[in-house]
């Protein structure tokens, strides 16, 4: 009985690992030039707020993928998904999750 339970949970863990490896994340995409320019602008901020500015730009890029109306600069930060979603955008885990929430 204990071996069966252990094997069952091991199989479930392997399935979860395989599923997470197959999903496409925003960090897996090549950074577009417009996003790199935004990061360069954030680099020019004063040292006390530089890291905060970079984190905001990075977070906005990820959050713009499923929601292009989030901030006015979404088309600059996430050109893969804004203003028109390209096929690669529909493969992103964050976009798939948002689409599931909208449907259900």
Swiss-Prot record:
The keyword Signal applies. The lineage of its organism: Eukaryota, Metazoa, Ecdysozoa, Arthropoda, Myriapoda. One of its GO terms (cellular component) is extracellular region. Keywords: Disulfide bond, Secreted, Signal, Toxin. It is found in: Secreted. Contains 3 disulfide bonds. The keyword Secreted applies. This is U-scoloptoxin(10)-Cw1a. It comes from Cormocephalus westwoodi. One of its GO terms (molecular function) is toxin activity. Expressed by the venom gland. Residues 1-23 form the signal peptide. Belongs to the scoloptoxin-10 family. Coiled coil: none annotated.
């Amino acid at each position: 009985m204990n071996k069966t339970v252990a094997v069952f949970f091991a199989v479930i863990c392997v399935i979860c690992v395989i599923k997470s490896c197959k999903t496409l994340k925003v960090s897996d995409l090549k950074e577009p030039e417009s996003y790199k320019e935004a990061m360069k602008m954030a680099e020019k901020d004063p040292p006390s707020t530089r890291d905060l500015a970079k984190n905001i730009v990075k977070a906005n890029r990820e959050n713009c993928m499923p929601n292009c109306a989030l901030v006015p600069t979404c088309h600059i930060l996430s050109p893969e998904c804004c203003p028109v979603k390209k096929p690669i955008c529909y493969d992103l885990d964050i976009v798939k999750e948002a689409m599931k929430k909208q449907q259900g």
